[in-house]
């Protein structure tokens, strides 16, 4: 098994506490509402929403995938960090065993957020990860951040 690690960084005008509430703590409700073509719904299969929780995310009709299951590894509400592992679903294909994600929101000098994300792709055997697969994932994540940011700008009282 090989492990390939990729890092990415996004910026937002929204401060970390508010963005963390929307993007992490209430994403299961917010994302299907603002991007139903991407995420149809999310459900907890096991756990209470904290570390160890298993979630099933069903993608919307606009997605090339049907569903994924992920396990929450950690949530740190004080330091605005979140990690989870994608453990099942057609997004893994035949080449990936799992994908682990670590996300941390830090305050930017302008009062917004810097979103730092690290992805660890665990392959089956000696398979190499195609760069376009990683770029496509980064683009989807960036677009989702932009949708959430747009929603928060348009709803200034939400998630305060």
Curated annotation (Swiss-Prot):
Q: Which SUPFAM superfamilies match?
A: Bet v1-like
Name the source's superkingdom.
Eukaryota
A molecular-function term among this protein's GO annotations: protein phosphatase inhibitor activity
Keywords of this entry: Allergen, Pathogenesis-related protein, Plant defense
Q: Which GO terms describe its cellular component?
A: cytoplasm; nucleus
Q: Name one GO biological process term.
A: abscisic acid-activated signaling pathway
The record's section on PROSITE patterns has:
PATHOGENESIS_BETVI
Chaperone found in the keyword field: no
Q: Per its UniProt record, what CDD domains does this chain match? A: Bet_v1-like
Q: Which family does it belong to?
A: Belongs to the BetVI family.
- This chain's protein is named Major allergen Pru av 1
Q: What is the source species?
A: Prunus avium (Cherry)
Q: Which gene encodes it?
A: PRUA1
